[in-house]
Swiss-Prot record:
<dbReference type="InterPro" id="IPR001717">
    <property type="entry name" value="Anion_exchange"/>
</dbReference>
<keyword id="KW-0449">Lipoprotein</keyword>
<feature type="modified residue" description="N6-methyllysine">
    <location>
        <position position="272"/>
    </location>
</feature>
<feature type="transmembrane region" description="Helical">
    <location>
        <begin position="824"/>
        <end position="844"/>
    </location>
</feature>
<dbReference type="InterPro" id="IPR016152">
    <property type="entry name" value="PTrfase/Anion_transptr"/>
</dbReference>
<feature type="transmembrane region" description="Helical">
    <location>
        <begin position="896"/>
        <end position="916"/>
    </location>
</feature>
<feature type="transmembrane region" description="Helical">
    <location>
        <begin position="1172"/>
        <end position="1192"/>
    </location>
</feature>
<keyword id="KW-1003">Cell membrane</keyword>
<feature type="transmembrane region" description="Helical">
    <location>
        <begin position="752"/>
        <end position="772"/>
    </location>
</feature>
<feature type="region of interest" description="Membrane (anion exchange)">
    <location>
        <begin position="706"/>
        <end position="1239"/>
    </location>
</feature>
<feature type="transmembrane region" description="Helical">
    <location>
        <begin position="1034"/>
        <end position="1054"/>
    </location>
</feature>
<feature type="compositionally biased region" description="Low complexity">
    <location>
        <begin position="141"/>
        <end position="155"/>
    </location>
</feature>
<dbReference type="InterPro" id="IPR003020">
    <property type="entry name" value="HCO3_transpt_euk"/>
</dbReference>
<feature type="modified residue" description="Phosphothreonine">
    <location>
        <position position="255"/>
    </location>
</feature>
<keyword id="KW-0813">Transport</keyword>
<feature type="compositionally biased region" description="Acidic residues">
    <location>
        <begin position="120"/>
        <end position="133"/>
    </location>
</feature>
<feature type="region of interest" description="Disordered">
    <location>
        <begin position="1"/>
        <end position="237"/>
    </location>
</feature>
């Protein structure tokens, strides 16, 4: 600076003001006096004393550990950005020096290295230096008791101003030098952002007293608060062009104006280069790790004060993301505003320009050029990571300052860019609400409240000044807003969430953090400017987002329209990147710009580029999805191989430990089918696994969803009980009918729900058991054996077989029952259902043939027919029993229109139930109404067709046979207890032993249905928490069936469709599902109460016998047909039969088509078809009882024969179990698509 000799300043003498009486005529001129004062003030000794004095005021606690951010901060601020020489202590505050504590040791200043080398800085010393500066600044905030707030000055020119005021008391004092005096602000709404163009035009709108100087033209008012002074070195960063006295744009320049005027231009340039340019590798001190034990930062332990202390490192844990793209457009009044044009929760949703409504979610398609432009702008734009701001104006001010510093925009464009950032935000949902506008911008709120203030009231410059083209704002305005608490909302204005907002909030995850993307064209800029901001903490920015979600990231891109850049596409690109899981995790964990660029490169590596050719149809793009899946799979594999090198995952020890715990838990997962090698070991493990949750099985039922599930499952269980009961009565001549099946379902259901390991299973009668009952009844009738007595001995053998299977832990055998066997079984039962339906219908047409038009009135009709018609008429009354199953003269024959009405009832029931099931996944009505209608489709179809039949009084139809009260179906044939030794004649002893063979066959059916159903319910995708018990459930179901045979009740098994429906009804889906994404399971209400109540309600249904007697058998045939047709859904064998008649070019894009040659696929289908034909042939002969044995032979056939014909790769494609739980509402997809099992 100056080479003149200087006297070291002593104490407060360097700040003393000369006495007025000492200024006489003989006093030397003021220029010489000012130069002497300036030399004494700017002396090196004085500067060194200030540093020593500041360093003696305490510091941070030793032992603080530094990171790379601290070192970068130290290099950028402490060594290259110096404090202004005008920031001296006032006289009173300077006298109070903090004495050194008793434990404080004197230390050598690091800059006083005697050797002239670059000294090495201890970390503890660096902390103490920073703390000393901070406490020195805190001392400034405490005025002395004898001083008034207005007597505290902070700048050198203010000290000179005080000297000039004292000199003005002398008559001979000349005109004072230009100065500025700062006084405290009057109120929160003060006008503080006005830049002075002329000294005479200074406006004091908020009580801030400005000077009347004439030489300070072009400089803003300096900010000063009484008793308050704090330094933030990061905010003091400036470019060199701001330091000139004539071109100063900021109030606190790093050099004094007097000093700047005295120095030459070369000296000023040297000063700018020294203070503001960051030359890599120059004057960087070596940092040696300090071996102190304490790891707590000294900043944490300071007492609160006006000096902002450094906060701990910002949490970088990735959150779910919500991205909103806002573009700078003109509204209908031709005023600029930020308008939302797209949003991302997981997929992109665009606003349709014409209708102003949201389009369908879709995968964002980006142009490759926009991605490259985005990477280039990120490489050269402003990147602010962990910005500590809480309001949009504060963030905007920091962004604009960083743009000026990085020379992206000119200094004169600062105000325009700032005003552009603070424009109003509008959303498509704003116009849908007819109430008070939901999003209130700063400008509209100011205009709204302006009518309630008087003329003398002070106004906030944020809401009264125009947004574009007004007076530029200064740092004073934004800092004042940051320091003062946020204003309270005005009375009478409340922010209520609209219906649209609440619906959108349900789709957004609870802990999501938002990203705001602002892009647009502004003509006042000469080139594009960009800023990427990551806030230190997520904050809610008022009137910015469509929904109140805290904002963590902001991206800004402004530029002229003349630039060769598509701002909209670049905004879509960064929005899509932020919605990508890997990239937004990298954005959370990024420490510098290079991390973001690396994440963009990783995104480009997994992106798919389509050639610029015309696509004639969507089928041409089928390979894109497959190729993208391969790229994502490769990306996941690379992430698993290099989790730490990629920098995309947290590296903390806690996260690593948590990951290891999860992996260990997955590896040690308890497999319920794993054998223990001990007798009944699996049963004991099932009891130990499931019974500790017994009490919670009742507590978890206290939920409204469980009550709704009870009503739904009741009808789902009652309809098959009535249907199969009526058909079973037809097959067994009413030895077992509706009453027996209802009682069996109720009793076994209650016991199973109280003792079973998986209470979500619904046990009931099924098609395979119906086929076996018919076959065994035919066998007993042909051999003159008592059917019910034979069932008793089969029941005894069933119990022994179940005990033997559980003791040997044989439930693991269910793993060998592959899709090959399951599909053959399910297809066979579906064919039987369909065949039986039309067989019964043909039989009705044979018993009641169609007559000609004159036949009904002719006299050729004999008296027997007239008498049967007369007998048939009373059956239409509600109090008469149905004559179904009776022989002789009691059963009417040859009735007119009976066959046609039966056909109408059967077809009507089938089509109503079938289309109501389709309606469940249609697009009509809200989803909740559709699900209710679809779930109750079968009861609704039965009710409608019963009313149709009841309304036609002139036509006879055969009704369901149901007894009155608690009675068996045919009391004249049997009772409730069956004698094992024989009812009418002694039962043969050889048959008691031979009953083992049919018992094995029944056990095969029950084992397959129960265990496969348990496997389907227990899939990992269903997220069950309490586990299942294969051995315990099998033992209970088979043992109860054996005991129920003593009472003439039918055997039951786990009904697959009803069990899956029960589990789905108790599944709670997460509402935070992105539009277009698959629904996710939140929890499953695993409890016993719903199954228990359903079983009791089914048992009580026996009292509605009068209502059940009104159901025609033709309606049950329609339900039978419905179950047969719907069971074909999800059977891959049925789909491959279609491919036999389809050209290869029309084959679907599935695994077994793409990975297996067409001829080999057709060969596999032919083998399944051959096995199905063999089973059908067996069931059509007298050996139909052995069909379960033929079915189980398909298991070794698949394991031995097919593995020699097909390769392992082909078998994995053709025989893989790819069925997953179905929860979404895709058309034509429901529970039947999940299981290749019969109904």
């Amino acid at each position: 600076m100056s080479s003149a000799p200087r006297r070291p300043a002593k104490g407060a003498d360097s700040f003393c003001t000369p006495e007025p009486e000492s200024l006489g005529p003989g006093t030397p001129g003021f220029p010489e006096q000012e130069e002497d004062e300036l030399h004494r003030t700017l002396g090196v000794e004085r500067f060194e004393e200030i540093l020593q004095e500041a360093g003696s005021r305490g510091g941070e606690e030793p032992g603080r550990s530094y990171g790379e951010e601290d070192f970068e901060y130290h290099r950028q601020s402490s060594h290259h950005i110096h404090h202004p020489l005008s920031t001296h202590l006032p006289p009173d505050a300077r006298r109070r020096k903090t004495p050194q504590g008793p434990g404080r040791k004197p230390r050598r200043r690091p800059g006083a290295s005697p050797t002239g080398e670059t000294p090495t800085i201890e970390e503890g010393e660096e902390d103490e230096d920073e703390a000393s500066e901070a406490e020195g600044a805190r001392a400034l905030t405490q005025p002395s008791p004898v001083s008034t707030p207005s007597s505290v000055q902070f700048f050198l020119q203010e000290d000179d101003s005080a000297d000039r005021k004292a000199e003005r008391t002398s008559p001979s004092s000349p005109a004072p030098l230009p100065h500025q005096e700062a006084t405290p602000r009057a109120s929160k709404g003060a006008q503080a952002g006005t830049q002075v163009e002329e000294a005479e035009a200074v406006a004091v709108a908020s009580g801030t007293a400005g000077g009347d100087d004439g030489g300070a033209s072009g400089r803003p008012l300096p900010k000063a608060q009484p008793g308050h002074r704090s330094y933030n070195l990061q905010e003091r960063r400036r470019i060199g062009s701001m330091t000139g006295a004539e071109q100063a744009l900021l109030p606190r320049v790093p050099t004094d104006e007097i000093e700047a005027q005295t120095l030459a231009t070369a000296d000023l340039d040297l000063m700018k280069s020294h203070r503001f340019e960051d030359v890599p590798g120059v004057r960087r001190h070596l940092v040696r790790k300090n071996a102190k034990g304490s790891t707590q930062s000294g900043r944490e332990g300071r007492e609160p004060g006006p000096t902002p202390r450094a906060r701990p490192r910002a949490p970088h844990k990735p959150h779910e993301v919500f991205v909103e793209l806002n573009e700078l457009l003109l509204d209908k009044n031709q005023e600029p505003q930020w308008r939302e044009t797209a949003r991302w929760i997981k997929f992109e949703e665009d606003v349709e320009e014409e209708t102003e409504r949201w389009g369908k979610p879709h995968v964002a398609s980006l142009s490759f050029r926009s991605l490259l432009e985005l990477r280039r702008t990120l490489a050269h734009g402003a990147v602010l990571l962990d910005l500590d701001q809480q309001t949009l104006p504060g963030v905007a001010h920091q962004v604009v300052e960083q743009m000026v510093i990085s020379d992206q925009i000119k200094a004169e464009d600062r105000a325009n860019v700032l005003r552009a950032l603070l424009l109003k935000h509008s959303h498509p949902s704003d116009e849908k609400d007819f109430s008070f506008p939901r999003n209130i911008s700063a400008g509209s709120l100011g205009s709204l409240l302006g009518h309630h203030h008087g003329q003398g009231a002070e106004s906030d410059p944020h809401v009264t000044e125009p947004l574009i083209g007004g007076v530029p704002e200064t740092r004073l305005e934004v800092e004042r807003e940051r320091e003062l608490p946020p204003p309270a909302p005005p009375a009478g204005i409340t922010r209520s969430k609209s219906k649209h907002e609440l619906k959108l909030l349900e789709k957004i995850p609870e802990n999501a953090e938002a990203t705001v993307v602002l892009v647009g064209c502004v003509e006042f800029l000469s080139r594009p400017t960009m800023a990427f901001v990551r806030l230190r903490e997520a904050v809610e920015l008022d009137a910015v987002l469509e929904v109140p979600v805290p904002v963590r990231f902001l991206f800004l891109l402004l530029g002229p329209s003349s630039a060769n850049m598509d701002y909209h596409e670049i905004g879509r690109s960064i929005s899509t990147l932020m919605s990508d899981k890997q990239f937004h995790e990298a954005a959370y964990l990024a420490d510098e710009r290079e991390d973001l660029l690396t994440a963009i490169n990783a995104f480009l590596d997994c992106s798919v580029v389509l050639p610029p050719s015309e696509v004639q149809g969507e089928e041409l793009l089928r390979s894109v999805a497959h190729f993208q899946r391969q790229m994502l799979k490769k990306r996941e594999e690379q992430g698993r191989l290099l989790p730490t090198g990629a920098g995309l995952e947290p590296k903390s020890a806690q996260d690593k430990a948590l990951l290891q715990m999860v992996e260990a838990a997955g590896a040690a997962e308890d497999d319920p089918l794993r054998r223990t090698g001990r007798p009944f070991g699996g049963l004991i493990r099932d009891v130990r696994r499931r019974y500790p949750h017994y009490l919670s099985d009742f507590r978890d039922a206290l939920d409204p969803q469980c009550l709704a599930a009870v009503i739904f499952i009741y009808f789902a269980a009652l309809s098959p009980a009535i249907t199969f009961g009526g058909l079973l009565g037809e097959k067994t001549q009413d030895l077992i009918g509706v009453s027996e099946l209802i009682m069996s379902t109720a009793l076994q259901g209650v016991v199973f729900c109280l003792l079973g390991a998986q209470p979500l299973l619904v046990i009931g009668f099924s098609g395979p058991l119906l086929v076996f009952e018919e076959a065994f009844f035919s066998f007993c009738s042909s051999n003159h054996l008592e059917y019910l007595v034979g069932r008793v001995w089969i029941g005894f053998w069933l119990v022994l077989l179940a005990l033997l299977m559980v003791a040997l832990e044989g439930s693991f055998l269910v793993r060998f029952v592959s899709r090959f066997t399951q599909e053959i079984f399910a297809f066979l039962i579906s064919l039987i259902f369909i065949y039986e339906t039309f067989y019964k219908l043909v039989k009705i047409f044979q018993e009641h043939p169609l007559h000609g038009c004159s036949a009904s009135n002719s006299s050729e009709v004999d008296g027997g027919e007239n008498m049967t018609w007369a007998v048939a008429r009373p059956t239409l009354g509600p109090g008469n029993r149905s004559l179904a199953g009776q022989s002789g003269q009691g059963k009417p024959r040859g009735q007119p229109n009976t066959a046609l009405l039966s056909l109408v009832l059967m077809a009507g029931t089938f089509f109503i139930a079938f289309f109501l099931r389709k309606f469940k996944n249609s697009r009509f009505f809200p989803g909740r109404i559709r699900r209710v209608i679809g779930d109750f489709g079968v009861p609704i179809a039965i009710l409608i067709m019963v009313l149709v039949d009841y309304s036609i009084e002139d036509t006879y139809t055969q009704k369901l046979s149901v007894p009155s009260g608690f009675s068996v179906t045919a009391p004249e044939k049997r009772g409730w207890v069956i004698n094992p030794l024989g009812e009418k004649s002694p039962f043969p002893v050889w048959m008691m032993v031979a009953s083992l063979l049919p018992a094995i066959l029944v056990f095969i059916l029950i084992f397959m249905e129960t265990q496969i159903t348990t496997l389907i319910i227990s899939k990992k995708e269903r997220m069950l928490q309490k586990g299942s018990g294969f051995h315990l459930d099998l033992l209970l179901i088979v043992a109860m069936g054996g005991i129920c045979a003593l009472f003439g009740l039918p055997w039951l098994a786990a009904a697959t469709v009803r069990s899956v429906t029960h589990a789905n009804a108790l599944t709670v889906m997460s509402k935070a599902v992105a539009p277009g994404d698959k629904p996710k399971i939140q929890e499953v209400k695993e409890q016993r109460v719903t199954g228990l109540l359903v079983a009791l309600l089914v048992g009580l249904s026996i009292v509605i016998g009068d209502l059940l007697r009104q159901i025609p058998l033709a309606v049950l045939f329609g339900i039978f047909l419905y179950m047969g047709v719907t069971s074909l859904n999800g059977i891959q064998f049925y789909e491959r039969l279609h491919l036999l008649l389809m050209p290869p070019k029309h084959h679907p894009d599935v695994t077994y088509v793409k990975k297996v040659r067409t001829l080999r696929m057709h060969l596999f289908t032919a083998l399944q078809l051959l096995c199905l034909a063999l089973l059908w042939a067996v069931m059509s002969t007298a050996a139909s009882l052995a069909f379960p044995f033929i079915l189980i032979l398909t298991v070794p056939l698949r394991m031995v024969v097919l593995t020699r014909i097909f390769t392992d790769r082909e078998m994995k494609c053709l025989d893989a179990n790819e069925a997953e739980p179905v929860f979404d509402e895709r058309e034509g997809v429901d529970e039947y698509n999940e299981m290749p099992m019969p109904v």
